[in-house]
Amino acid sequence: MTDAAQNVIVLKDAYDRWAESKGDSADHWTAIFADKIKFGSLAQGSYGAAYLTAYQTRDQLAQYFAGLKRDWEMLEYVAEHYVAQGDRVVMLGHCSWRNRSTRKVVATPKADSWRFADGRAIEFYEYYDTAQLRDAAV
């Protein structure tokens, strides 16, 4: 099996667990992150979601997952397609979340870009509708 195919298998399992737990558990994510990771989110800390920003280590990512869990209720997370080439994988899907304070819902297409080395994720960047995020957070 190629590294690209193995990386897709790892991600499919992680996305399945994420959806099944409704965002309640991040252990499956932290298990695949390298100690040092270049991690980014399109919102870059805007819209009252300071945790949707850049991180450099797996330990720092606890802030990201704690913020999501505190502020948002996952309604749906569907990873539909995976495109893999070499050390990179892109996941295309959609998700919806309800803001716990405003009760407003974000339903957005989702694209995640991953890069792997030695079986661990060393880069991640997520893309989603930041206008909906802004509108739901206020």
Model-based region annotation:
Residues V10-L11, G45, L61, V89-M91, ...:
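Hydrophobic aliphatic residue packing
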Residues M1-A14, A50-Q60, E80, A107-T108:
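Charged, low-complexity, helix/coiled-coil-prone segments
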Residues M1-D35, V138:
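Short, low-complexity N-terminal intrinsically disordered segments enriched in polar/charged residues
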Residues A31-D87:
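A solvent-exposed, acidic/Ser-Thr-rich amphipathic alpha-helical stretch
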Residues M1-A5, A66-V138:
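A beta-strand edge to alpha-helix "cap/lid" segment located at domain peripheries
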Residues W18, A50, R103:
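Generic anion/oxyanion-binding catalytic loop in active/binding sites
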